[in-house]
Amino acid sequence: MKQGFTLIELLVVVLIIGILSAVALPQYTAAVEKARATEVVTLMAQAERAADMYVLEKGYPASGLVELVGDNGSKTGKLNIDIEAALKCTKGDDVCVSKDFAYDVYCDTSACHWSAGRNNESYVLSADRSRGGKWERSCYYNDKEGKPVCMGLKGQGWSIDGNE
């Protein structure tokens, strides 16, 4: 008596594995992207608090703007958190660039602003706080990959805008 699998049995197993991976991979990718966005939201909440402390201590700039992150040598000590280390930045001028995002935090004469743009340009998270106001957060998506990330933030007080 012969033992083993027939060609048909092997093909059926390969087909089932293919179907399962075709269904699971997009769900996995979406979950990973939402996790990245959640990490950014958490880190940028620290940036909001740090920018608020900066304004309380030094006030809004009289003219122009003050970059609060980056690595051009002039921003050291502007924030009371080591945001560049937390975001794992590489050297850059006015922005902090990590593996997945490019960050910018600054204050000008009337407001503070932060943004975190996904390096593949599928979505951008940003927030603005004018004098005496509160942080207004928004998420803008450019494609199908960014849309679920922004929609996941909708119920948390974020305004959503997109171009799919």
Q: For each of these PLM feature ranges, what is it?
A:
Residues E57-E164:
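Periplasmic/extracellular, small/polar-rich flexible segments of pilin-like filament-forming proteins
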Residues G18-A22, A47, C96, G133:
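Short linear sequence motifs
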Residues M1-V32, V40:
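N-terminal single-pass transmembrane signal-anchor helix
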Residues A22, A30-V69, L79:
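Conserved hydrophobic/amphipathic alpha-helical signal-anchor segments
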